[in-house]
Every structure is written in structure tokens, then in C-alpha cells.
């Protein structure tokens, strides 16, 4: 059973994840651009810290969702919570690596550019394994989400899953990068976190 204080914290986590996710997408898509690669000296530290905080906020949302949705006797929900929480922890750690290498006191064989590219291309895998949790939350949270919430949650979950698999298969068209990032990252995912915040407030 979730307490009133936990619901309040969960709502704050959802708002934090929404704000940071939107800021990250706006910086990476519209400030740096889709052709940017490597570590950016100006935006790198900001992106790293913002990404880490975003994943931490997401971990809070995911962790408390088990109590919010009463995941007892819901094995797929419980499993998706564990998976999403674990890969989000990976996201927290890797987000800070490029800045740590760039500001290292000694020379390393791994450069900040290499680390930034590594983080950029592991992030789709992280979101791929968070996708099942989105789908499960949409399923079991339909009674406490806004009326439009389950549809958005399923679109985010299945959309990210399909797009990521297409990308990993090497079939992702370059021309679709910005439109899909705008739809999934700037519109639907923040809307989904807003819906989740409403579920915690219900």
C-alpha cells in the first residue's frame, strides 16, 4: 500500500523526469543537432549531469510504481519494474563518464569523445529495456491515469521498442531522426510522465 508521502514523492519524481527529459532532447536535437558527435566542451557537463538526474528521477518513479499499482500477483509488472530500475542505474553511471574522462588528472586510452559516443549509442538500449515498464504501467494504471494516459503510455512503450529495434538492425532512415525524436521525445514521453504524475496525485 502506497502512503500519501510516497505518492507526493512519486509525483515530484515524475515532474523532474519530465522537465529534464524535455531539456535534454531540446539541447541534443536542436542545439547540438543530429550530426553532433563526441564530447561537447560547453554542453557536455550540463548534458551529463542532466541525464544522470533524469535517470535518477525515473528510477524513483519506477521504484514507487510497484506500490502505487500494487504489483503483488502481477509478475510482468514486477519484472518490468526490476528491469527498468536496473537499466536506469546503468544510465545514471554512464551519463557521467564522458565528463569524468574529460576532466581526468591523467591521460587515458579512452577519450571523452569516445565515451560520449558510447553513451549516445547505449542510451537506445537503455530505453528499449524501459519500454516494457511503460506498457505495464499503462495496463495496470488505467484506472488512475488520465483518460488519454494509457494510449500515450502504450504508444511510448511500443514506439520506443520498435524504433530502437529498427535502429539496432541498421534500418533506421536518417531523415526520420528529428521527426521521431520530436514525436517520441519532445511530445509523447513528457506527456506520458505528466500522465504518470497525475496517477500519483490521484
Residue map of PLM features:
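Hydrophobic, aromatic-enriched alpha-helical segments typical of multi-pass transmembrane helices
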Residues: 1-202
Amino acid at each position: 500500500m502506497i502512503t500519501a508521502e510516497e505518492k507526493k514523492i512519486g509525483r515530484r519524481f515524475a515532474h523532474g523526469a519530465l522537465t529534464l527529459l524535455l531539456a535534454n532532447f531540446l539541447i541534443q536535437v536542436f542545439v547540438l543537432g543530429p550530426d553532433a558527435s563526441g564530447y561537447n566542451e560547453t554542453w557536455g557537463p550540463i548534458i551529463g549531469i542532466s541525464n544522470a538526474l533524469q535517470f535518477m528521477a525515473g528510477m524513483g518513479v519506477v521504484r514507487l510504481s510497484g506500490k502505487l499499482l500494487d504489483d503483488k500477483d502481477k509478475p510482468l509488472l514486477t519484472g518490468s519494474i526490476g528491469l527498468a530500475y536496473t537499466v536506469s542505474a546503468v544510465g545514471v553511471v554512464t551519463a557521467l563518464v564522458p565528463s569524468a574522462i574529460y576532466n581526468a588528472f591523467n591521460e587515458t586510452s579512452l577519450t571523452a569523445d569516445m565515451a560520449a559516443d558510447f553513451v549516445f549509442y547505449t542510451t537506445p538500449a537503455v530505453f528499449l529495456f524501459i519500454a516494457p515498464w511503460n506498457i505495464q504501467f499503462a495496463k495496470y494504471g488505467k484506472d488512475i491515469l488520465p483518460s488519454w494516459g494509457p494510449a500515450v503510455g502504450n504508444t511510448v512503450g511500443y514506439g520506443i521498442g520498435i524504433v530502437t529495434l529498427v535502429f539496432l538492425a541498421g534500418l533506421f532512415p536518417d531523415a526520420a531522426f528529428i521527426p521521431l525524436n520530436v514525436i517520441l521525445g519532445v511530445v509523447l514521453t513528457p506527456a506520458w510522465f505528466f500522465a504518470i504524475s497525475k496517477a500519483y496525485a490521484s
